[in-house]
Amino acid sequence: QGKKGLDVLHFSPEWSLQTRLRNDTGLGKYVTADLSAPEADIHLDITSMTLPDGSFDIVLCSHVLEHIPADRQAMKEIARVLRPGGVAYIQVPLNDALAETDEDPSVTDPHERERRFGQFDHVRMYGPDIEDRLRNTGFKVTAVRPASVVGEGEMARYGLWDDVIWRCQR
């Protein structure tokens, strides 16, 4: 018997990445999840997942948490569904100029949300303290800049942004 591939849970999957991962025969199980998108494999509330503990080796969560009022609960749930040693790759809008994350649940006006949080449906703009939030969930956290992995040429070629990706190991 060959070694089983890694099981991946992908929240609000980007079409191009989803297509590539679905065709990756080296993966074990690849599952897409979203609260309401009809094309998702499963419909999940990221703050209260109906999945067993330790179900996945990898969780991909790019530009999701800024939409979730209870982001810390979502982080706990991500940690819960990861197997020991599993890794979540989390990306959020980040403003390094902020002393701390800007969030205010009383802000419901779409124009004010766009002004403060960068988009009408965001509930916060993360500051550098996102790293502490992730660590306080129990993750071992490493900040990764894509340019440090693929280089500036590849970044330009594929039109990638150099936004921090948080590598969060359980």
Where are these regions (language model features)?
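Class I SAM-dependent methyltransferase SAM/SAH-binding core
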Residues: 3-48
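Activation segment
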Residues: 39, 50-53, 68-69
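A short SAM/SAH-binding and catalytic strip from SAM-dependent methyltransferases
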Residues: 57-69
